Amino acid sequence: MRRLLCLLLCLCWLPAISLTSARAADKAAETPAGLPAEVRVVSEVWVNYSQADGRGLAWDLLRAIYEPEGVRLSLRSEPYVRSVGLVQRGEADAWVGSYRNEIDHIIYPHWPYDVDPIGALGLKTSPRPTLATLDRYRLAWMRGYAFDRYLDHLKQRNELQRRSSALPMLDGHRIDYFIDARPELEEMIEAKGVDASVYHITDVGSIPLYLGFASNDRGRALAKLYDSRMQVLYRSGELERIFARWHWPYAPLIPLLPPKE
């Protein structure tokens, strides 16, 4: 009977011991400042921006933001829609390339980290559109991209699963223009086997880019640190040096950043 009582008492203590161990593990995974020991960031693969090998403007910028504060960058490459889902489920802390308030129940920092130049890719035989005339044409862009929420006249569209579908659809006259960030459009028509001379890209707008953080305590802490460090990098000139290292346009971001004091 005594042995049974002792066993029951031990079983009663197990949840408390497990909870204490979990809390200790969480505490060990924090920096001395109480921040998470790592920031888990997920992104679609973009050349010279967020490559799967850890190279690119976005990855260098995030290392400069977090690692001096003892927070290690843990990166992961996934398609855009899956990246958003991982953050929504708390399996990642943030994703790269969000537009502000694009997704509900996500924490957006105050400061953007880049500006997305948006272009319309079409056949050279097609007229050059303006933002005001785009609604006259058959448009397409990548699934999950919310261009229609941030640029007027982008209502009717096809959503594509793969960028590789865009050029055949243009060539077959199934769409008139493919909408995307200009660097992506340039990469498409500069690819091997593509005759760039039959296409043209028209700039139609720009949209500030943010990290989208998970709506939890980790996300709030990491977003707060991001805003603080962005100001430091901007005022020290390090932010501009990171952009220069990757030959990335910096001037469009300057009006959106805090004033230098």
Regions found by a protein language model. Name each.
Residues 85-89, 98-106, 176-205:
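A ligand-binding cleft/hinge motif common to bilobed small-molecule-binding domains
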Residues 121-139:
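Flexible hinge/capping segments at coil-to-helix
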Residues 26-106, 140, 236, 246:
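Extracytoplasmic small-molecule ligand-binding "clamshell" domains
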Residues 43-44, 115-118, 190-227, 250-261:
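Periplasmic-binding protein-like
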